[in-house]
């Protein structure tokens, strides 16, 4: 949802839009809670409070002040990510298709012939890093830019088996127009940039597990972050390959040679970061014009020095000349060298051309070895061709996508590799590597071993759920790692599937109850965004490829109502109850009936089950930004930090009742996952709360009334306001609590309206209006370790007779309290008080 704050109402009506006017009788937190549970996508918030907007944004719900109609029109028609700290809106708006254009934020693409293969009459537009060049389109009171691009489709095409780009991009645009927006993926770059900048400032050592190419620009400015990936393809790994011949397969209609060069250099750069943890000088020989340097410089201040007879416009220092082996002495330490020397074939005979290529390959290798033979802190990536070669066994082979698969591949070496044992590799084996291997990632660092790190902050986004990892080891890491942000695939199946397929892999699935963490926040993507200064206008699809975000060691843990809070907890319930269900009271009715409380009079105002816990369980797929386990734990320990709002502290037994209702709901819906989740949350409640039951009571609290509007034949009709199992030494403590609640007890608005048979030969009158006070007193007794209340639900009633009688219905009648007393069962009254 998105909340657009206005000082004045607007005359125009918008689809899927609701108006909310700030309620001055409620504080900012209550207003935020009410807004968050509205069911439309767009909320026009009138007479707004800035504090309420802050609360919503911290909760991950995009909430923005609107000053002009242009701002309203722009934000209401698309989704966006909002940086509420820096006041920047990142639109995810594809309406630019109506200009017959596709967009990119990678400059090198604009220098290719891609426009020859677009839809007829279409063009390509460069929009800058996260759409920064579009800021001029929006003259708004906040900074606004459109981060939507088609780079995801272009890159997917490059790695696909499709050759016809026009057909491919047409299909992708049609898909984009007919399927739900993948909002998390679109906002992820904004999130990653914010996340790693924040963590790099706050933590000395940061470890990142499982980066992919989507992050290849994100980490350019973070050389100290330690990366873990799937490891490199080494020369010695070719021993498994059978010999093949030249294939000559075209991968792309438009020229992607620059993309290949960029990936080669970035792979080398990140290998340098991995070893030396600082930025090198980047030397490049023969890869002009290297327009992609412009892209790299949008993210980092890396320095490039280049050699080529052709211009390299974005190099810091370009030598418009050939590079010879004697020029190696001009190259400094603390550097990487990219060698991409290859003479154009022109009209040369094929055999002559082949001889020249092999000779240049040998020369390139000599330059690489000479560069690595002296000095320190150096890594080299050199262009190779398939030929009989001796190569160091520990050198890394690279084969990033290029326009055509021919004879070309690349070799990456550091100083140690260049001095290592060399092995003869036949030409046919290298062709086998080239024909069958595409390097899919610029991050080729070693895999992460699933163990805790004492002084490091671990980040693992979408990296650990894969079933190649041992599930128990993943759980153990999350339980024990002190500082981390780790994601795992949420179990949003209905049959409690232990793993689910995604693309061509399988992921383990998890619920919050799979982890034993008492210092971590377990939330959703949008809940995590709020913690890092971002909010989003569209939540993830409830049955999509969704993840739990687990933050350990955060200073936000105790701020229960500010982050990963209960905002939107009733939203799905409202959507169902006010549209599909038999009555808008369905949730209240079901919760009472499923706990054998059949008095439904006033069920919507006097309910004995925690609606928070019930909704958090049965609709967890729709809102798991609310960290239910943390909410339970902090209340059980009394450590919850509450900033504001009308906050009602549930008695632990209300939480148990909610689990029982959720369990009943799950059985009716055949939802095996919710059934397990409810059981495990109930077990967790029993673990963190020391709940005892007075199922064998020796005292009770009685309420005697001045008026009973029914016939009765018991000696003194009374309401049993709970039973206790206590020693005589505890009587003074019980009496102190009763005295403390005297005014509230006598102030209860107690009513009755019918009689019924509670059981065979037990004829009673219903009682309404006491549950709220009952649970407050329950909490007071619980905190003093006084056993109060039974394991079955407390159903308020007055016993009238121990015989079978007919039900009587009367007008709702108020009952007036005469006295409240504490009496021993089958014994004497030990305390009483009157109003």
UniProtKB/Swiss-Prot annotation:
Does the record carry Cell division as a key word? no
- Catalytic reaction annotation: a 5'-end diphospho-ribonucleoside in mRNA + GTP + H(+) = a 5'-end (5'-triphosphoguanosine)-ribonucleoside in mRNA + diphosphate; a 5'-end (5'-triphosphoguanosine)-ribonucleoside in mRNA + S-adenosyl-L-methionine = a 5'-end (N(7)-methyl 5'-triphosphoguanosine)-ribonucleoside in mRNA + S-adenosyl-L-homocysteine; 5'-triphosphoadenylyl-(2'->5')-adenylyl-(2'->5')-adenosine + 2 H2O = 2 AMP + ATP + 2 H(+)
Q: What is its EC number?
A: 3.1.4.-, 2.7.7.50, 2.1.1.56
| Gene Ontology MF terms | GTP binding; hydrolase activity; mRNA 5'-cap (guanine-N7-)-methyltransferase activity; mRNA guanylyltransferase activity; RNA binding
Determine if RNA-binding is one of this entry's keywords.
yes
Subunit structure, interactors included: Interacts with VP1. Interacts with VP2.
Q: Which HAMAP family match?
A: Rota_VP3, Rota_VP3_A
Q: What does this protein do?
A: Multifunctional enzyme involved in mRNA capping. Catalyzes the formation of the 5' cap structure on the viral plus-strand transcripts. Specifically binds to GTP and displays guanylyltransferase and methyltransferase activities. Has affinity for ssRNA but not for dsRNA. Capping activity is non-specific and caps RNAs that initiate with either a G or an A residue. Together with VP1 polymerase, forms a VP1-VP3 complex positioned near the channels situated at each of the five-fold vertices of the core.
Q: What is the name of this protein? A: Protein VP3
Per the UniProt entry, what species is this protein from, by scientific name?
A: Rotavirus A (strain RVA/Human/Japan/S2/1980/G2P1B[4]) (RV-A)
